[in-house]
């Protein structure tokens, strides 16, 4: 069970609620709500054996996805035609940036040091991601 630990490394208490499932929303509801609020909805590591949506549900459900993230090349049709990106999902410092990807962004992708999510959304929709592997 998780415990609350202070800066001095001493246990300060136990959480009052189970934190393993912090949301009461289902997958479809969460994706729809994120999209409604302008987020880029990108299901993560959809191909993982543990916790990947394809292995949990048997398929990738339809959704308002800007892209999908995969650990390795996907089987034909598994990504339902969405642009595939990669990420590290690092649990150890040495795993940070081990699966980078690049994205060709359009003119005007940044304004005053702020990245335009619309520019990222446009580049993902156009399939302008370059991966460390072929899909």
Residue ranges and their predicted role:
Residues 1-2, 7, 18-19, 40, ...:
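Charged catalytic cores and adjacent phosphate/nucleic-acid-binding surfaces used
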Residues 1-36:
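Alpha-helix-centered segments that form part of catalytic cores
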